[in-house]
């Protein structure tokens, strides 16, 4: 979260599940619900979660001192447990959705994290 704050990141793209074949592959770094979590001196609160058939969009409010920002996570949720998707159709739809969503944003925001 410090990197997200320091680089003024507004969008996170996640392509994997947190667990694959029973092994942890990615830390669950975001809150499970609207209860805030604290990472160092940064507070993270999920403000919305839209679960779609192939991806989930989460919005977070992150606070550092008296400053607050909004961060969005695009989580592609149908990547198979092992290997690659059988077709690229849903992944291409996901990429197009993400691009449409973030293309109109202000140019003064930081890099998207994948």
UniProtKB/Swiss-Prot annotation:
A single GO molecular function term of this UniProt record: cadherin binding
Catalytic activity: O-phospho-L-tyrosyl-[protein] + H2O = L-tyrosyl-[protein] + phosphate
Residue positions binding substrate: 81
Catalytic class of the enzyme: hydrolase
Domain Tyrosine-protein phosphatase as annotated: residue spans: 1-114
Record InterPro entries: Prot-tyrosine_phosphatase-like, PTP_cat, RTP_Phos/Ushers
Protein name from the UniProt record: Tyrosine-protein phosphatase 11
Organism name: Styela plicata
């Amino acid at each position: 979260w410090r990197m997200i704050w320091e680089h003024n990141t507004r969008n996170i793209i996640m392509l994997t599940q947190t667990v694959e074949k029973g092994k942890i592959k990615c830390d669950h770094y975001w809150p499970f619900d609207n209860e805030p979590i604290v990472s160092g001196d940064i507070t993270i609160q999920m403000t919305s979660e839209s679960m779609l058939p192939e991806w989930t969009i989460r919005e977070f409010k992150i606070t550092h001192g008296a400053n607050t920002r909004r961060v969005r996570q695009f989580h592609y949720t149908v990547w198979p447990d092992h290997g690659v998707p059988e077709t690229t159709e849903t992944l291409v739809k996901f990429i197009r959705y993400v691009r449409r969503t973030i293309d109109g944003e202000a140019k003064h925001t930081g890099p998207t994290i994948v």
